[in-house]
């Protein structure tokens, strides 16, 4: 008969595509999964069964060997992160325009149980932004998000500020629209420090929505993962 896996907690569902393909290529058995990504408690994760009525022991042993000794499917619970938010931009800092970025970020974080515990408004001063990133990290936040100042305009210096904070940059730029000017980095102890482009403020879904579940779950995001987003990375503004 069929066996189903369901999520016991809210979290990030991930899988090893190469090994899943290898197991399904053996024949006489199958594993069907949902796409990797955020799930809620009670969501179906996978279904599996043998195809014939009976199956040889040797075939099952081959499947176990092919699957390997590490989990083929993984559900990682979200962590209750403390987040530092650095909102940059002289227009916002001097009150010429309203800060519309912060409410959006707080709402997106709340979806995954994360909370902004440190927040500051700063002008386009990369040294001040760098100093505040370091201060938030020293205060023990689990992640720092910097909004604004991510384009190629000469006044936009947030990428420089992040790099000067002593982090390890994974990527500056992503093959996703909207969200191409995204910056992802990590501290030496694995805390994410990100630069968010302006599209995160007004677009329903961006690169930030793709990586945020990984950041909250504590699953490292690699340069290869970001590059792979190019296939399907063009948002068509589907109603979801």
Residue spans of the language-model regions?
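Pocket-edge structural micro-motifs
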Residues: 7, 49, 87, 195-197
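Short glycine/threonine-rich loop/turn motifs
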Residues: 90, 100, 117-240
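Glycine-rich phosphate/diphosphate-binding loop of Rossmann-like nucleotide-binding domains
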Residues: 69-124, 128
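Extended, charged alpha/beta regions that create polyanion-binding interfaces
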Residues: 1-78
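Short coil/turn connectors at secondary-structure junctions
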Residues: 41, 79-83, 140-141, 189-191
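Short, acidic Gly/Pro/Ser/Thr-rich loop/turn segments
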Residues: 12-13, 53-54, 91-95, 201-203
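Short, surface-exposed linear patches
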Residues: 26-29, 67-70, 105-110, 166-169, ...
């Amino acid at each position: 008969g069929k066996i189903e896996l369901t999520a016991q907690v809210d979290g990030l569902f991930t899988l090893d595509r190469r090994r899943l393909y290898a197991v399904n290529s053996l024949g006489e058995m199958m594993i069907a999964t949902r796409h990797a990504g955020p799930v809620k408690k009670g969501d179906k994760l996978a279904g599996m069964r043998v195809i014939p009525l009976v199956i040889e022991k040797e075939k099952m042993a081959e499947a176990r060997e092919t699957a390997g000794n590490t989990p083929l499917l993984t559900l990682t619970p979200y962590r209750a992160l403390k987040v530092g938010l650095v909102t940059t931009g002289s227009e916002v800092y001097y009150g010429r325009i309203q800060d519309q970025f912060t409410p959006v970020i707080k709402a997106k974080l709340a979806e995954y149980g994360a909370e902004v515990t440190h927040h500051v408004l700063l002008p386009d001063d990369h040294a001040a932004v760098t100093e505040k990133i370091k201060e938030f990290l020293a205060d023990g936040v689990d992640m720092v998000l910097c909004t604004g100042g991510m384009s190629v305009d000469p006044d936009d210096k947030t990428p420089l500020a992040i790099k000067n904070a002593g982090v390890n940059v994974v990527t500056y730029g992503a093959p996703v629209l909207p969200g191409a000017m995204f910056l992802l980095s990590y501290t030496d102890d694995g805390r994410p420090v990100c630069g968010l482009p302006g599209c995160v403020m007004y677009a329903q879904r961006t690169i930030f929505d793709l990586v945020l579940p990984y950041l909250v779950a504590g699953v490292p995001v690699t340069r290869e993962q970001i590059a792979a987003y190019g296939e399907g990375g063009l948002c068509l503004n589907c109603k979801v």
